[in-house]
Each structure stands twice: as C-alpha cells, then as structure tokens.
C-alpha cells in the first residue's frame, strides 16, 4: 500500500497518544500490575492455567481471571498496532521514541506483557518486543533479553 504524499502523521500520533493515556489503558495497566503483585511466583503461567479452568459458572475469581486476560490483550494490542504502523511506514521510529513509547511506558510491555507471552509459549514471537527494545535499549530492563 502506498502512503499518500502529504500524509499527516500528527493525526495518527494524536490518536495513538490518546489510547496510551486513556482511562481504559490506565485501568488495564493497574489490573495487570495488581495481578502480578498478588499472585506470587508463577503469576504469568497462573493466568493461563486459570483461563483454561473457566467454565459457564463465573465466580468472582473467574471474573478476575477473564478481566485480567482482557487487560493483557488490550495493552498488547496497543503496542502491536503502534509497531505495525511504524513498520508499514505510517509512523517513523522517532515518533514512537519521542511520543508514544517512552521508556516508562515500555516497562509495562517488557516486565508484564512479555512475561505473559513467555509463560504462554516459551518460543513466542519476539519481533514486537525486539522492535521496542531497539528504541531505548540502554534505558530499559527487559527480563526477556
């Protein structure tokens, strides 16, 4: 797909910025941080084990599992979408490092989302995580590196 000659990236950056700073993102991030903080070692694998146990009888614990997984998927989708816009030429790497993927935001990606990916499948696709790692390599702690 050809990018229009006068494509204005600022509209796309503004939209993505609004997503990353939304109440929805904030609530999802807090849900994931709470899960990690309260589930002890094995917190990432525990989510997927409990997802497999969910049936039609939805208890408070099962609801928490489903909400936590929805939060994981939402945040991962924001990062994936932003990375794809960059890799397809709609955004430049500088747009991400300056506006959308500051080091403090990437800690959620590396310290929680990537750990979930590894727990689900040790041979997970690292492309998106490597992409963001390259933006701020020196400044970030990445357990999966």
Question: What residue ranges belong to the model's regions?
Answer:
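Aromatic- and Gly/Pro-rich amphipathic surface segment
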Residues: 43-61
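An amphipathic alpha-helical interaction surface
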Residues: 60-145
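Membrane-proximal alpha-helical anchors
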Residues: 1-49
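Intrinsically disordered, low-complexity coil segments
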Residues: 35-39, 56-65
């Amino acid at each position: 797909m050809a990018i229009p000659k006068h494509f204005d990236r600022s509209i796309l950056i503004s939209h993505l910025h609004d997503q990353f700073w939304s109440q929805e993102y904030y609530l999802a991030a807090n849900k994931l941080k709470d899960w990690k903080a309260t589930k002890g070692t094995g917190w990432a694998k525990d989510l997927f084990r409990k997802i497999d146990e969910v049936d039609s009888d939805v208890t408070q614990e099962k609801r928490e599992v489903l909400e936590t997984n929805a939060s994981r998927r939402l945040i991962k989708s924001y990062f994936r979408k932003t990375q794809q816009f960059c890799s397809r030429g709609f955004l430049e790497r500088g747009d991400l490092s300056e506006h959308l993927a500051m080091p403090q935001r990437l800690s959620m990606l590396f310290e929680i989302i990537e750990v979930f990916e590894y727990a689900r499948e040790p041979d997970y696709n690292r492309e998106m995580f490597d992409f963001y790692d390259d933006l701020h390599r020196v400044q970030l702690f990445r357990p999966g590196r």
